[in-house]
């Protein structure tokens, strides 16, 4: 779910309504192209040194590199017995994996992409797991409804990031947690940090994970390239490779050169 050159162009144009419309159409387009039972993760990959070597079911093994990012982000806190909301759940692979392995009391995946939610409901049928369509900047839940709000590689798509953060604060219970991972170009880092610091949430941890994401992309690159080439028409393959994370793309080079910063955070609501 990484941003492409569209992100920079729209940011310079300064039109949040245009920005939101582009993402509103882009993700359903990718779901129609990539949306089948084989492609349940659309986040970039992640691997540590030494490798994480998570014990996975055979059906999860093809998605190990994507699961690593979800696992490392989510396990900054204990999800066991918690009511969890994932904002921007994509194709639901992370929601399914975390529900099956970390045993939350309930797990709700929310996404603006109606086609993606339809795919999630069809593909991931588990006790305690639900999917709803909704806007990250206007969450359809009561105040203090969740113990954990998770967000993985998505908030760069939100035209009003502070509104999203305000919604996280609103729906989190006191003592709740916000494990979070995303990326920004260097010229947006100061604003990103300022927005995060302006919330009443208390930061527990923060680290840059460029090296781990690049390692994961490298390990997973051929698989991702093959998926794009197999499922997308030729005119969308360039954008598809940037979107899903393939070694040698412009965005991976920016990540390697330090022009992008990919970070993992954890916050709590006191």
From Swiss-Prot:
Instruction: One GO cellular component term, please give it.
Output: plasma membrane
Query: What is the main EC category here?
Result: transferase
**What Enzyme Commission number(s) appear in the record?**
2.1.1.-
Q: Which domain of life is it from?
A: Bacteria
Q: Which UniProt keywords apply?
A: Lipid biosynthesis, Lipid metabolism, Methyltransferase, Transferase
Q: Which GO terms describe its molecular function?
A: methyltransferase activity; O-methyltransferase activity; S-adenosylmethionine-dependent methyltransferase activity
UniProt-listed SUPFAM superfamilies: S-adenosyl-L-methionine-dependent methyltransferases
InterPro entries to which the protein is assigned, alphabetical: Methyltransf_11, Methyltransf_Superfamily, PthPhpthDimycoMt, SAM-dependent_MTases_sf
> What is the purpose of this protein?
Catalyzes the methylation of the lipid moiety of the intermediate compounds phthiotriol and glycosylated phenolphthiotriol dimycoserosates to form phthiocerol dimycocerosates (DIM A) and glycosylated phenolphthiocerol dimycocerosates (PGL).
What more does the entry say?
A: Was identified as a high-confidence drug target.
The UniProt similarity line reads: Belongs to the methyltransferase superfamily. Phthiotriol/phenolphthiotriol dimycocerosates methyltransferase family.
The protein's name is Phthiotriol/phenolphthiotriol dimycocerosates methyltransferase
């Amino acid at each position: 779910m990484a941003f492409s050159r569209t992100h920079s162009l729209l940011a310079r144009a300064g039109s949040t309504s245009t920005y939101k419309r582009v993402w509103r159409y882009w993700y359903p387009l990718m779901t129609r192209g990539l949306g089948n039972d084989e492609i349940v993760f659309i986040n970039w990959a992640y691997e540590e040194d030494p490798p994480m070597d998570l014990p996975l079911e055979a059906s999860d093994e093809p998605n190990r590199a994507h699961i690593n990012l979800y696992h490392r982000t989510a396990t900054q806190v204990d999800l066991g017995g918690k009511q969890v909301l994932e904002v921007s759940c994509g194709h639901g692979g992370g929601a399914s994996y975390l529900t099956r392995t970390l045993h939350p009391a309930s797990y709700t995946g929310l996404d603006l992409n109606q086609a993606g939610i339809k795919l999630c409901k069809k593909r991931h049928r588990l006790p305690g797991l639900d999917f709803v369509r909704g806007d990250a900047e206007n969450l359809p839940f009561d105040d203090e409804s969740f113990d954990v709000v998770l967000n993985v590689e998505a908030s760069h798509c939100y035209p009003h990031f502070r509104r999203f953060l305000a919604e996280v604060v609103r729906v989190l219970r006191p003592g709740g947690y916000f494990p979070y991972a995303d990326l920004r170009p260097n010229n947006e880092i100061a604003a990103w940090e300022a927005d995060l610091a302006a919330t009443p949430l208390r930061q527990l941890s923060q680290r840059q994970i460029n090296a781990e994401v690049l390692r994961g992309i490298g390990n997973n690159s051929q698989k991702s390239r093959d998926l794009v080439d197999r499922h997308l028409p030729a005119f969308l393959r360039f954008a598809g490779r940037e979107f899903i994370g393939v070694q040698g793309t412009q965005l991976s080079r920016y990540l390697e050169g330090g022009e992008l910063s990919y970070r993992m955070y954890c916050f709590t609501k006191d």
